């Protein structure tokens, strides 16, 4: 059972239709879920956990909220049976996910405040997330913009690409020669 970080304000039948408008952030529930994720994922207390482990714990709490909304969206698509756009690109430069997801859930400031109460700086936590190495410039950013536009306009769409195991390569110079190394971004 996924946790809910939001207090219900509408009946269950309306909840999925008005997922963002019908709920309010529950700070104490969020903090409890972060602590529990650190405990169950890493068998540590918050004091023992590294910044990366806390980042992962926070990300899992946010993912639990997003997955519920994603499933609700999929159910609506299944009912409506719309045409779906499949956008294929070799690159998708979506940016870092945690901050974007908090902004899109309209809870960035609330999460920042909750984490501050726990002695955690959200900006420093966001630095724990590497940029996904899914492209190197214009085409990747263009693909991300197309996907954002489709989502904003409410069009059902999927981005299709290649899941790079090592992403883009890192360039290193040894003895005056370029040497490529995999960028293990996952």
Over which residues does each language-model region extend?
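A conserved ligand/cofactor-binding region detector
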Residues: 16-186
């Amino acid at each position: 059972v996924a946790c809910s970080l939001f207090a219900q304000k509408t009946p269950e039948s309306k909840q999925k239709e008005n997922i963002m408008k019908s709920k309010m952030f529950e700070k104490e529930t969020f903090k409890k879920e972060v602590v529990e994720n650190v405990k169950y994922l890493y068998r540590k207390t918050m004091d023992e956990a590294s910044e990366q482990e806390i980042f992962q714990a926070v990300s899992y709490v946010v993912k639990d909220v997003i997955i519920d909304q994603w499933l609700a969206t999929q159910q609506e698509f299944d009912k409506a049976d719309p045409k779906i756009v499949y956008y294929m690109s070799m690159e998708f430069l979506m940016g870092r996910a945690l901050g974007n997801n908090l902004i899109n859930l309209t809870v960035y400031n609330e999460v920042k405040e909750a984490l501050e109460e726990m002695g955690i700086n959200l900006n420093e936590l966001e630095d724990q997330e590497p940029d996904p190495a899914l492209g190197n410039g214009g085409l990747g950013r263009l693909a991300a913009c197309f996907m954002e536009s489709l989502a904003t306009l409410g069009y059902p769409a999927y981005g299709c690409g290649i899941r790079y195991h090592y992403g883009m390569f890192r360039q290193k110079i040894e003895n005056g020669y370029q040497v490529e190394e995999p960028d293990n971004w996952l």
